Amino acid sequence: MITKVDRNAVRKKRHARIRKKIFGTAERPRLSVFRSNKHIYAQIIDDVKSATIVSASTLDKEFSLDSTNNIDAAKKVGELVAKRALEKGIKQVVFDRGGYLYHGRVKALADAAREAGLEF
């Protein structure tokens, strides 16, 4: 019998492997990305304190696009999270793609955050 592959379970296993290697500090926190079917979320996390420093998503009140699940929305979230991080004095981060392929919405968010001033 052939079993169907659960893509989200595979992603979670991949993310667990990645998280063993990626660790955010106060000087260089972790930029974590979560992607759902309708929205995209980004958090800047200090793993030493286990605290979220900055976050942005397509659910924010500042978000003004009609569609929340496309590349344009991801770019807007990347710009928002970078702007908020720079306001808090964070310039360098470690990028955590969350087990997703570095393509499409994840890549668009990362590129927009880089263009807005974050270094990774």
UniProtKB/Swiss-Prot annotation:
Pfam families: Ribosomal_L18p (PF00861). GO terms for cellular component: cytosolic large ribosomal subunit. It comes from the Bacteria. GO terms for biological process: translation. Keywords: Ribonucleoprotein, Ribosomal protein, RNA-binding, rRNA-binding. InterPro entries: Ribosomal_uL18_bac-type (IPR004389), Ribosomal_uL18_bac/euk (IPR005484). Disulfide bonds: none annotated. GO terms for molecular function: 5S rRNA binding; structural constituent of ribosome. This is one of the proteins that bind and probably mediate the attachment of the 5S RNA into the large ribosomal subunit, where it forms part of the central protuberance. PANTHER family: 39S RIBOSOMAL PROTEIN L18, MITOCHONDRIAL, LARGE RIBOSOMAL SUBUNIT PROTEIN UL18M. NCBIfam families: L18_bact (TIGR00060). Belongs to the universal ribosomal protein uL18 family. Part of the 50S ribosomal subunit; part of the 5S rRNA/L5/L18/L25 subcomplex. Contacts the 5S and 23S rRNAs. This is Large ribosomal subunit protein uL18. It comes from Geobacillus thermodenitrificans (strain NG80-2).
